Amino acid sequence: MVDTTKNTKLFTSYGVSTSRTVSPEMAAKLISKAKRPLLMVGTLTLEPEILDRVVKISKAANIPIAATGSSMASLVDKDVDAKYINAHMLGFYLTDPKWPGLDGNGNYDMVIAIGFKKYYINQVLSAAKNFSNLKTIAIERGYIQNATMSFGNLSKADYYAALDELINAL
């Protein structure tokens, strides 16, 4: 069992609140309870180890994917519900309760972020944190303070093990 709640270091001081660390099992429970979750993936998912796990997460919990950057190209032939959108625009749209969503069925109640550079996803999630009631879970290798919940800072091996635990718990 990987302890994803350790090694949490705050590298910046902006914002009035920071995310809580979350274990893979708790993240899986929260994802399973969400009515309209969205898996937001970045370009780091081009790494085969992460891409494989992203596909498994999407299929295990039947979660649509918002593919950002160049991540869409790797998801085209994976038999998942993926749509392309710019990450910053998605962050903007998620703050609008009347946004119809990527599928036209309404806004989302939870966003799960994976595959982003720390400095990038922190800025995107800042809008959701400060201007909406959206719950966000960052299942990243590093602690993301602007998410509602986040894994702690993990080694690569611990990160892959944590993602596998999350997949098995979904």
Swiss-Prot record:
The keyword Transport does not apply. InterPro entries: CdhB (IPR003704), DHS-like_NAD/FAD-binding_dom (IPR029035). Pathway: One-carbon metabolism; methanogenesis from acetate. Induction: Up-regulated during growth on acetate. Keywords: Methanogenesis. One of its GO terms (biological process) is methanogenesis, from acetate. It comes from the Archaea. Gene3D superfamilies: TPP-binding domain. Pfam families: CO_dh. Part of a complex that catalyzes the reversible cleavage of acetyl-CoA, allowing growth on acetate as sole source of carbon and energy. The alpha-epsilon subcomponent functions as a carbon monoxide dehydrogenase. The precise role of the epsilon subunit is unclear; it may have a stabilizing role within the alpha(2)epsilon(2) component and/or be involved in electron transfer to FAD during a potential FAD-mediated CO oxidation. Heterotetramer of two alpha and two epsilon subunits. The ACDS complex is made up of alpha, epsilon, beta, gamma and delta subunits with a probable stoichiometry of (alpha(2)epsilon(2))(4)-beta(8)-(gamma(1)delta(1))(8). Belongs to the CdhB family. This is Acetyl-CoA decarbonylase/synthase complex subunit epsilon 1. The gene is cdhB1.
